[in-house]
Amino acid sequence: MSYKYILLIAGLLLSGFTRTYAAVGDEDWRERATHLIYSPRYFGPNALPIPTLHSASVSNRWEVEFRGEYHHYTGDKTKNWYGRLYIPLVNNRVAVEVTCTYETEYTLTPETRDERFAAGLKNFDQILGDVTIGTHYQILRSEKWLDIVGRMYIRTATGQRLAEARFTDAAGYWFDLTFGKTIAKNKSGTASLRLHGMAGFYCWMTNSMVHRQDDAYTYGIGVTGKYRNLSIQTDYAGYTGYENNGDRPRVLRTNLSYELKKNILSFKYSHGMRDNLYDSYSLGYIRCF
């Protein structure tokens, strides 16, 4: 038998072995994916975020925000970029907000990987997160009573790395009402204290054949103090899911910001509780127009 035929047979055998090996690998991945738990406790820190607390006042200026974030707990350390675009459509009445995350690095412990049924311990390239698109509508603006804003968000399925339990690769949405009232301010308007709250509904798709989606109610309460160009906001927020499978995260957040000529620098710290396992730090820049 000539070398030509020997090489041909060897190539065919190698090709068949490669296809068989890949098929087995695919079956293993699919089997692991069926065990993923679609809740914030068993996914990365950006997969199913807790909605932010709004001041209940629709702004009439554009905002472009870039933020570097670091999330950590004993089983997962994650770094990502966060971007936000805020567009007023009707002066002080209607606005649109678009956000996205871009994870640059994460590292899991073997215990966390196994708990999440994730495919790996660290990323091999950057990971595009989910894009969220929201609308804000000023329902009521009253100094005597309350300011009320209605919000509706949809989360697209653009997030990557389902196998690594980073993003769910499934759509979701939430809507809520945010309430706000300024309870104290000086005559010059350079100092103020404002209370605000949130209540709404949160829903995301799952991989369960019994419950195709998880439903939750959202809530939050907070206070914002301002003095000249400096402001600090503290709030407590979370949501409570129907499944009770790690879908009841809580967070205590603090945001310190300073504005100068439509440029805002801000530092955020978030302390996760219950099914939110992470402490998070971020530094951001906002340009207003």
Where are these predicted regions, by residue range?
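Detector for outer-membrane/organellar transmembrane beta-barrel domains
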Residues: T168-G241
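Bacterial Sec-dependent N-terminal signal peptides
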Residues: M1-D26
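Outer membrane beta-barrel transmembrane domains
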Residues: T109, F117-G120, V210-Q213, Y217-F289
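Exposed, low-structure sequence patches enriched in small/polar residues
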Residues: Y3-Y5, Y82, F201
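Transmembrane beta-barrel domains of Gram-negative outer membranes and organellar outer membranes
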Residues: A22-T156, A171-T178, A184-N186, L230-D235, ...
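Outer-membrane beta-barrel and related beta-rich outer-membrane complex signature
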Residues: P110, L162-E164, M209
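Transmembrane beta-barrel outer-membrane domains
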Residues: T74-T78, F124-D130, R166-G172, S188-T190, ...
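Short, well-ordered, mixed-charge alpha-helical segments that flank or form enzyme active sites
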Residues: T156-L162, W204-T206
